[in-house]
């Protein structure tokens, strides 16, 4: 995998200025978290405002954790999202009912868990691999054992979990993901991005 072609998603956006910085840096997607228990949660009202000036070819990803069907539909109706990202224990049937491209996040401890998710969520646009945690649904700042990722998965996968400017090149070289997802590794505090860290993260990948 050529690091220059790695796709990048920056997640947990809560401020317009952080989204604009991500756009200026050339990221492929930004993530909005619609989960009240998250420190990076955004309301529908705020989401409408901060996505207002996102140009074409920068995807908006709605990140959800075990949501009600009606809430997902409301987001689809109100926000111009290109992708849904399910970060809980949602079934494949639940994820596909919205007729919207989706990403299924899992928190694997074994290679078997990863392969099982690829098989179960066969119609997902990608599988996202994040760090297992009993306390947090992403944004832990911790990596997981990349050695468990099977080679030659039949589906594109997104690597997440504890990525930052110091380890991202090693992660890409070792894991060869289709894309990477960064959140806490580019923050000054939860939901507030550090623009210098954002720039350094991009430079570490693309040069």
UniProtKB/Swiss-Prot annotation:
Catalytic activity: N-(5-phospho-beta-D-ribosyl)anthranilate = 1-(2-carboxyphenylamino)-1-deoxy-D-ribulose 5-phosphate
Assigned EC number: 5.3.1.24
Domain of life: Bacteria
Protein's UniProt keywords contain Transmembrane: no
GO biological process: L-tryptophan biosynthetic process
UniProt protein name: N-(5'-phosphoribosyl)anthranilate isomerase
GO molecular function: phosphoribosylanthranilate isomerase activity
Keywords of the record: Amino-acid biosynthesis, Aromatic amino acid biosynthesis, Isomerase, Tryptophan biosynthesis
One family name in Pfam for this protein: PRAI
UniProt record similarity statement: Belongs to the TrpF family.
Functional pathway: Amino-acid biosynthesis; L-tryptophan biosynthesis; L-tryptophan from chorismate: step 3/5
């Amino acid at each position: 995998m050529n690091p220059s072609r790695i796709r990048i998603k920056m997640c947990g956006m809560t401020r317009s200025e952080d989204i604009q910085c991500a756009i200026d840096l050339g990221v492929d997607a930004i993530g909005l978290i619609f989960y009240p228990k998250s420190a990076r949660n955004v309301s529908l009202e705020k989401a409408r405002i901060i996505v207002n000036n996102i140009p074409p070819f920068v995807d908006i990803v709605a990140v959800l954790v075990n949501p009600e069907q009606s809430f997902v539909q409301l987001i689809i109706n109100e926000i111009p999202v290109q992708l849904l990202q399910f970060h809980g224990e949602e079934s494949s049937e639940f994820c596909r009912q919205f007729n919207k491209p989706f990403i299924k996040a899992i928190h694997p401890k074994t290679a078997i868990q990863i392969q099982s998710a690829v098989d179960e969520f066969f119609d997902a646009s990608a599988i996202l691999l994040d760090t297992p945690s009993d306390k947090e649904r992403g944004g832990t700042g911790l990596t997981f054992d990349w050695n468990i990722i099977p080679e030659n998965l039949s589906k594109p996968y997104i690597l997440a979990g504890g990525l930052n400017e110091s380890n991202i090149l090693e992660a890409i070289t070792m894991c060869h993901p289709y894309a990477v997802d960064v959140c806490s590794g580019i923050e000054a505090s939860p939901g507030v991005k550090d623009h210098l860290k954002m720039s350094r993260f991009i430079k570490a990948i693309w040069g």
